[in-house]
């Protein structure tokens, strides 16, 4: 049973960095992480948009499965560092690594199949990120056919079952329980202090939601900024919301802690309902429960709101 990380980037993986001869690392700078999913056709456009806003600390995360002309890319983009994982990693884990390498105050996370619609508006979003000091400002997004994507995510309970609902964004800096597709402007000090993404949760949907839920449980916020707009140039990613192993980890960490008198704790009777609800045998249920129990105890003073209060009062907050 993997132990839930309690510190940022706790899980060390093997990776290589290539290029970056003119890479600038300045603490007050805004860095960028370009995640790899589509082809290279949009890469020059993203780089131009980032340079237009003065971003010269850029990491491009490459897929081990994708063949690229690395020598040519290093020569053409000397201010970009190319991060090459040497083993299988989760999306969140590569973001953790990239943020630790950048060492900037703010980091823009994008995918290489996303186009930044307006660099000047992105500059406004960055200025708001600095003044608001939220965990993350996530972008408004449209499809390749210019249809608005519902990127505002609400936590909901239906007949006692937790899920999320996507609705269109209509107001600037509206809260969202997670940043759609991991994209956004992250405040790095807060991100690191909160532990980043949990590498033990391998399903991207639950990993992203785990980070977002923890953000709100611990008193911070993720909001959608209408100045920051991206366009998808390929098909939208499909979110896998199935109740898999990642869900069981998300559930015990985020939905079952009791919060009272300024701290969180796990009631032991949660074990029995957890075992029944997940269909586990006692041994397996105890292993999962113990990992969650220890993690909640370790972070008990960081919780600021009970999980179900957060959900039920979401629209009023």
Regions found by a protein language model. Name each.
Residues 222-317:
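Active-site-adjacent helix/loop segment of glycosyltransferases
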Residues 178-179, 183-184, 190, 194, ...:
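A short, conserved alpha-helix in the catalytic core of glycosyltransferases
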Residues 105-115:
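Short beta-strand-to-loop acidic/aromatic patch adjacent to the donor-nucleotide binding site
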Residues 50-84:
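Acidic donor-binding segment of Leloir-type glycosyltransferases
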Residues 1-48:
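N-proximal low-complexity "stem/linker" segments adjacent to membrane-targeting elements
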Residues 137-153:
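Short beta-strand-to-loop element that shapes/binds the nucleotide-sugar donor at the catalytic cleft/hinge
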Residues 85-102:
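Glycine-rich, basic loop-to-helix element that forms the pyrophosphate-binding segment
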Residues 166-186:
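A recurrent flexible, glycine/aromatic-enriched loop bordering the glycosyltransferase active site
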């Amino acid at each position: 049973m993997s132990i839930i990380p309690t510190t940022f980037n706790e899980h060390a993986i093997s990776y290589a960095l290539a290029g970056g001869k003119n890479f600038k690392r300045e603490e007050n700078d805004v860095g960028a992480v370009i995640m790899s999913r589509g082809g290279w056709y949009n890469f020059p456009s993203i780089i131009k948009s980032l340079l237009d806003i003065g971003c010269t600390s850029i990491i491009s995360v490459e897929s081990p499965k994708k063949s690229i002309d690395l020598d040519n890319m290093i020569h053409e983009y000397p201010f970009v560092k190319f991060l090459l994982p040497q083993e299988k990693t989760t999306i969140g884990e590569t973001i953790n690594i990239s943020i630790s390498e950048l060492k900037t105050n703010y980091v823009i996370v994008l995918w290489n199949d996303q186009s930044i619609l307006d660099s000047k508006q992105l500059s406004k979003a960055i200025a708001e990120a600095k003044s608001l000091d939220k965990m993350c400002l996530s972008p408004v997004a449209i499809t390749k056919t210019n249809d608005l994507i519902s990127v505002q995510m609400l936590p909901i309970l239906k007949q006692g079952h937790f899920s999320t609902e996507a609705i269109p964004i209509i107001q600037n800096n509206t809260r969202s329980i997670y940043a759609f597709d991991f994209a956004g402007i992250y405040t790095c000090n807060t991100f690191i202090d909160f532990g980043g993404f949990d590498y033990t949760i391998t399903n991207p949907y639950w990993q992203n939601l785990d980070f977002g839920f923890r953000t709100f449980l611990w008193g911070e916020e993720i909001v959608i900024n209408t100045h920051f707009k991206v366009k998808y140039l390929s098909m939208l990613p499909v979110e896998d919301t199935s109740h898999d192993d990642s869900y069981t980890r998300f559930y015990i960490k985020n939905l079952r802690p009791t919060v009272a008198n300024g701290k969180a704790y796990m009631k032991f009777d949660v074990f029995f309902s957890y075992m029944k609800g997940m269909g586990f045998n006692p041994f397996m249920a105890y292993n999962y429960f113990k990992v969650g129990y220890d993690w909640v105890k370790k972070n008990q003073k960081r919780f600021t709101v009970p999980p179900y209060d957060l959900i039920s009062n979401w629209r009023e907050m």
